[in-house]
């Protein structure tokens, strides 16, 4: 995983954007997930807690108005592009990017051809916000993975830890249009 870094002290990241100097006051170690834009310039960082910190993720933008899409600098837009929520999940799929959250609008506004995009949201059928975003994404006629009922794990990372063949599950459960709507109705729990 050559896309990840480690820092001993979270307060070191303030040098990337002085706006955060008053909000980051702790000194704990963090896993650093860097975000680069399409021009391969650093656009932000997500720092993940390693010891069960109350604030699990701290995201820092270099420029306030720049979108953070992990992996956008490495993706081949002429092939299927898998769009997941978290940077760590994206490391388990070839040609994937991460939204740094659940908003799909970032990717909808990107330069990736619509037919090449496959949204792979977390498996949280009881999360109303997520369910609404999955519904909106289906209504916008994108390819969406609808997890089968047999999958109980929340995200790709958990599935990999459970020895689930994630690529096979995604391949067999990617839907669009009316079929996606039908599978979505079966999947959601709110």
Predicted regions and their residues:
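Phosphate-handling DNA/RNA-contact segment within nucleic-acid enzymes
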Residues: 2-116, 130
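TOPRIM fold recognition
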Residues: 43, 55, 78-81, 87-190
């Amino acid at each position: 995983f050559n896309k990840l870094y480690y820092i001993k002290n979270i307060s070191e990241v303030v040098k990337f954007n002085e706006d955060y100097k008053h909000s980051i006051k702790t000194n704990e170690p963090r896993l650093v997930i860097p975000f680069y834009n399409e021009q391969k310039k650093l656009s932000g960082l997500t720092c993940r807690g390693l010891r069960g910190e109350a604030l699990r993720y701290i995201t820092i933008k270099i420029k306030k108005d720049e979108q953070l899409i992990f992996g956008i600098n490495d993706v081949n837009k002429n092939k299927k592009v898998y769009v997941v929520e978290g940077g760590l999940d994206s490391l388990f799929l070839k040609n994937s990017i991460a939204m740094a959250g659940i908003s799909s609008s970032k990717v909808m506004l990107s330069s990736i051809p619509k037919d090449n995009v496959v949204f792979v949201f977390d498996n949280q059928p009881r999360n109303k916000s997520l369910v609404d975003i999955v519904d909106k994404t289906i209504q916008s006629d994108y390819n969406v993975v609808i997890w089968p009922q047999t999958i109980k794990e929340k995200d790709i990372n958990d599935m990999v830890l459970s020895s689930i063949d994630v690529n096979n599950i995604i391949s067999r459960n990617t839907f669009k249009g009316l079929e996606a709507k039908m599978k979505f109705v079966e999947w959601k729990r709110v």
